């Protein structure tokens, strides 16, 4: 009984950081996890702090290089997120092999000048040599101090 309880708590703790996303490609993304965020509850992004993102996806192409593109739509205005390292090979093994699963652990600092908002949509695209590797949209985010 004790082992089942411990296993259940471990599964719940791992699942608690998984974020609901809308796929904007061909369902290559298996899951997205952000510490402190869960499910469809709004994810609070704090200005001037490190933001961590983990994504698991299947490569839909062979690619020597990979890039990440992050855009935020804040109160209806889309902007490129500044200050990101867009070279995914710094965060995962390259080259990519079609059909293989990859796990990215990506961290960047949210600029202090980011506008506060209760209505933020974040779009993350992973790009390979031949176009989009994977794409996800998180529709429940807020930017606060």
UniProtKB/Swiss-Prot annotation:
Region forming the signal peptide: 1-16
CDD domains according to UniProt: Der-p2_like
Disulfide bonds: 24-135, 37-43, 89-94
Keyword Cell wall biogenesis/degradation: no
Domain of life, per lineage: Eukaryota
This protein's record includes keyword Transmembrane: no
Main location: secreted
This protein's GO CC annotations: extracellular region
A GO molecular function held by the record: sterol binding
Keywords per UniProt: Allergen, Disulfide bond, Secreted, Signal
InterPro entries registered for this protein in UniProt: Ig_E-set, ML_dom, NPC2-like
Subcellular location: Secreted
One GO term (biological process): sterol transport
Family, as annotated: Belongs to the NPC2 family.
This protein's name: Mite group 2 allergen Eur m 2
């Amino acid at each position: 009984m004790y082992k089942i309880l411990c296993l259940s708590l471990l599964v719940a703790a791992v699942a608690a950081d998984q974020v609901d996303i809308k796929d904007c490609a061909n369902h290559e993304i298996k899951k997205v996890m952000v510490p402190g965020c869960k499910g469809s509850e709004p994810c609070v992004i704090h200005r001037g702090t490190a933001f961590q993102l983990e994504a698991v996806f299947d490569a839909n192409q062979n690619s020597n290089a990979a890039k990440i593109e992050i855009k935020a739509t804040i109160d209806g205005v889309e902007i490129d997120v500044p200050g990101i390292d867009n070279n995914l090979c710094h965060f995962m093994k390259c080259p990519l092999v079609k059909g293989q699963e990859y796990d990215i652990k990506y961290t960047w600092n949210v600029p202090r000048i980011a506008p506060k908002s209760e209505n933020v949509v974040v779009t993350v695209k992973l790009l390979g040599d031949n176009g989009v590797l994977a794409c996800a949209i998180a529709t429940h985010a807020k930017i606060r101090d």
